[in-house]
Design a protein with these regions (language model features):
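A juxtamembrane structural motif centered on a specific transmembrane helix
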Residues: 133-200
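Structural signal for the C-terminal ends of transmembrane alpha-helices
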Residues: 96-106, 167-174
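Alpha-helical transmembrane segments of multi-pass membrane proteins
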Residues: 11-15, 94, 121-131, 165
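Hydrophobic alpha-helical segments of membrane proteins
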Residues: 56, 86-93, 125-134
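Hydrophobic, glycine- and aromatic-enriched re-entrant/interface helices and adjoining loop segments
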Residues: 2-91, 109-117
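Membrane-interfacial segments
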Residues: 21, 103-110, 143, 174-179
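Residue-level signal for the membrane-embedded core of alpha-helical transmembrane segments
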Residues: 36, 87-97, 117, 121-124, ...
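Loop-to-helix entry and N-terminal half of a specific, functionally important transmembrane alpha helix
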Residues: 106-144, 150
Length: 200
C-alpha cells in the first residue's frame, strides 16, 4: 500500500516536473497523432508486429531498419516482424524459465540472505522484461531499457550475466550436501579455524 502510494506520487510529480516524461506519456497515449514525428518509433514497431503475424515474414526478410534503435530498445519488434508471434512467445517463455529457476533457487536456499537475494534478482529480471516488452507493445510508456541478452549494450549485458552468475552460485550452494558431523564436532567447530601466531 505504502509502496504503491509512493510510486504513483513520484510518477505524478515526475510528470509535472519533467517535459520528457510528459512527451513519453503523450506518445504512449496518442502514438498515431504524430506518426512521422515523436510517435514514429512506436508506430513502426506496432506495424512490424502486425506485418509479422503468427509466423513472421521470414528470417532476414523483414525491415527492422524502419524502427529507430531496433538493435537495442526495439529488438523485440524486429523479432516479431521476421519470426512472428511464435518467436516472441518463445522468447517470453525463455525469460519465464529464467525467473522460475531464480525463484526455485530462492526456495531451496538454506539461509535467509540467499533467499532474499535470489528473490530480489528474480524480481529485478522480471520487472526489466515487463517494462521493455510493455513499452514496445504499448502496454506502458517507453522507458529506454534494453531487452536482456538480446539488445545491443555492453553494460546491460554484463549486468544481466552478473545476475545469472549470482543465481547460479546460490543454487549451487543450496544443492551441495551438508558436511557430515562426528559426535565430537558441531557446525561451529567446522566453521572455526585456529591460526597460530608465531612471535618473532
Amino acid at each position: 500500500m505504502v509502496g504503491g502510494l509512493l510510486f504513483f506520487g513520484g510518477a505524478a510529480t515526475a510528470f509535472r516536473l519533467f517535459s520528457h516524461v510528459q512527451s513519453r506519456v503523450d506518445i504512449w497515449l496518442h502514438p498515431f497523432a504524430d506518426p512521422d514525428g515523436n510517435g514514429y518509433q512506436l508506430v513502426q514497431a506496432l506495424y512490424g508486429f502486425a506485418w509479422g503475424g503468427l509466423v513472421g515474414r521470414g528470417l532476414g526478410e523483414g525491415m527492422p531498419e524502419r524502427v529507430p534503435y531496433a538493435e537495442s530498445d526495439f529488438i523485440l519488434a524486429a523479432i516479431g516482424e521476421e519470426l512472428g508471434l511464435t518467436a516472441v512467445m518463445a522468447v517470453l517463455l525463455l525469460y519465464g524459465l529464467v525467473v522460475e529457476r531464480a525463484l526455485r533457487a530462492a526456495l531451496i536456499s538454506r539461509d535467509g540472505f540467499g533467499k532474499l537475494v535470489a528473490t530480489g534478482l528474480a524480481a529485478v529480471f522480471a520487472l526489466q522484461i515487463f517494462v521493455v516488452i510493455g513499452g514496445v507493445t504499448r502496454l506502458i510508456p517507453l522507458t529506454g531499457l534494453t531487452t536482456p541478452f538480446l539488445s545491443y549494450g555492453g553494460s546491460s549485458l554484463v549486468a544481466n550475466w552478473v545476475i545469472i552468475a549470482i543465481l547460479l552460485r546460490i543454487s549451487d550452494q543450496a544443492r551441495r550436501p551438508l558436511p557430515d558431523l562426528t559426535e565430537t564436532e558441531d557446525a561451529d567447530e567446522q566453521a572455526t579455524q585456529i591460526v597460530k601466531v608465531v612471535d618473532r
